[in-house]
Design a protein with these regions (language model features):
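Short aromatic-glycine-(Arg/Gly/Cys) micro-motifs in beta-strand/loop hairpins
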Residues: 1-60, 91-137, 166-174
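Short, mixed-charge low-complexity intrinsically disordered segments
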Residues: 39-96, 138-142, 148-179
Length: 179
């Protein structure tokens, strides 16, 4: 499993009305912050791909916002104070370990639509109560356990085959501490 890196916008109660509306709409009252790869809720802080990025990013359809070179990424975001520096693994086959390039803490698993929109089935689809309960999500909106995340991924696909947001990739998410 290869780690990828991304820096996303923080989404917290400090976002005022946007946060309040999101909590009201989603019903995720346990959240103290949302950490997700959902591009509508937690967009990347480097939305434009510069020419010098190409040697340092994932060169795959819909994945060019992810970096493979942690040090290069950190140089690009050095001047940004409020940010989530994330290490992620797409479709891990077991619980991954973050590389020692920074002090990363494991936050949990997200499930994002496989093709194109990067919408989280956990936090941006108004829930799938027949598959998982909102109360299963952590204070940052993620599933804690690998086995449960795989089960939710499998059940979303089998119980909602017509729903594009239910065809998901599983993402393990770690956040850098102290950066």
């Amino acid at each position: 499993m290869t780690p990828w890196f991304i820096v996303t916008k923080q989404f917290t109660p400090n976002d005022g009305n946007a946060w309040s509306k999101y909590i009201q709409r989603s019903g995720l009252t346990q959240l103290t912050e949302l950490v997700s790869l959902d591009t509508m809720l937690c967009p990347t802080l480097l939305p434009k791909i510069k020419d010098d990025y190409w040697a340092h990013i994932v060169n795959e359809d819909f994945m060019i916002r992810f970096f493979v070179d942690f040090d290069f990424l950190m140089e690009q975001v050095a001047g940004i104070e409020k940010k989530n520096v994330l290490c992620v693994f797409r479709n891990p086959t077991q619980q991954p370990m973050a590389p020692p390039v920074a002090n990363f803490e494991f936050l949990g698993f997200d499930l994002l639509e496989t093709y194109g929109s990067d919408t989280s089935a956990l936090t941006n689809c108004e829930g799938f109560p027949d598959v998982f309960a909102n109360s299963e999500l952590s204070s940052v909106g993620l599933l804690h356990e690998f086995e449960r995340a795989v089960d939710v991924q499998t059940r979303l696909r089998s119980m909602h085959p017509e729903e594009p947001h239910a065809d998901c990739d599983l993402w393990a998410i770690f956040r850098a501490v102290g950066i």
